[in-house]
């Protein structure tokens, strides 16, 4: 319940239809809508409409989304490698915002001290090292901000580097918590595949924002339905919701026609 995930998603729209949007492909007709979301308790907590060309960078867009979001002190912010600025990590630490992310392997840093690694047998990840470091920014400038760098290797042999400012949790806990970031990717998939979050009924910014808010309200109601009925997965929950809605509509038709709605339960 403490995990607050942040990520952005893109929607491609023809530049002939769209006045507002980011040019990410270098062509005037290649415009995209970029939205930065916050997700907590499986429910969208915030959405930010990116309008400036500079916000094509996650170091700007996603950081602004985090800064504008309503965060609790105990929240743990989860985001991917889109945010890579050492200064951003320093600012989050100074603002006492807990975060867990990944960084590119072989990122330049200065070692401050090494933490002891307690191995857990039969784990999906092998922890290679657990270190307190200072990262380097561009032009090899060291940023004086102690962060924790956890190096791990998965079963496929790929090396993963996790970065956090949380010092009291074990390295395995940090890696395990980061997996929960994937929940926002599942949410994006649900929006685009099942709620048709691929098309807009309006192509100006105000109209698109109204549409997005309506869509998110529908998504929140659907998540509440899923949790209330103790259903796992969006696909199964959507099927169950569709069947229940269909039955309710048929009952209304039967009542309107003067029939017995109880017979609907016997036949469906």
Regions found by a protein language model. Name each.
Residues 23-25:
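Extracellular beta-strand-rich solenoid/capping regions of secreted or surface-exposed proteins
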């Amino acid at each position: 319940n403490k995990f607050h995930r942040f990520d952005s998603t893109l929607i491609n729209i023809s530049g002939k239809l769209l006045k507002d949007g980011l040019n990410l492909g270098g062509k005037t007709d290649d415009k995209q809508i970029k939205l930065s979301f916050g997700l907590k308790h499986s429910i969208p907590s915030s959405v930010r409409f990116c309008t400036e060309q500079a916000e094509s960078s996650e170091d700007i867009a996603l950081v602004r989304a985090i800064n504008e979001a309503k965060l609790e002190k105990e929240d743990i912010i989860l985001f991917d490698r889109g945010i890579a600025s050492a200064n951003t990590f320093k600012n989050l630490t100074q603002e006492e915002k807990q975060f867990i992310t990944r960084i590119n392997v072989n990122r330049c840093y200065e070692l401050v001290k090494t933490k002891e690694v307690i191995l857990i047998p039969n784990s999906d990840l092998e922890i290679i090292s657990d270190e307190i470091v200072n990262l380097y920014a561009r032009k090899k400038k060291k940023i004086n901000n102690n962060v924790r760098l956890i190096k791990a290797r998965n079963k496929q042999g790929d090396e993963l580097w996790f970065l956090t400012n949380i010092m009291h949790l074990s390295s395995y806990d940090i890696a395990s918590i980061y997996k929960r970031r994937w929940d926002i990717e599942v949410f994006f998939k649900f929006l685009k595949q099942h709620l048709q979050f691929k098309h807009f009924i309006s192509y100006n910014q105000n109209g698109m924002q109204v549409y997005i808010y309506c869509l998110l309200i529908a998504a929140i109601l659907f998540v509440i339905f899923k949790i209330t009925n103790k259903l796992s997965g969006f696909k199964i929950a959507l099927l169950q919701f569709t069947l229940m809605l269909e039955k309710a509509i048929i009952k209304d038709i039967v009542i309107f026609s003067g029939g017995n709605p109880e017979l609907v339960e016997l036949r469906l």
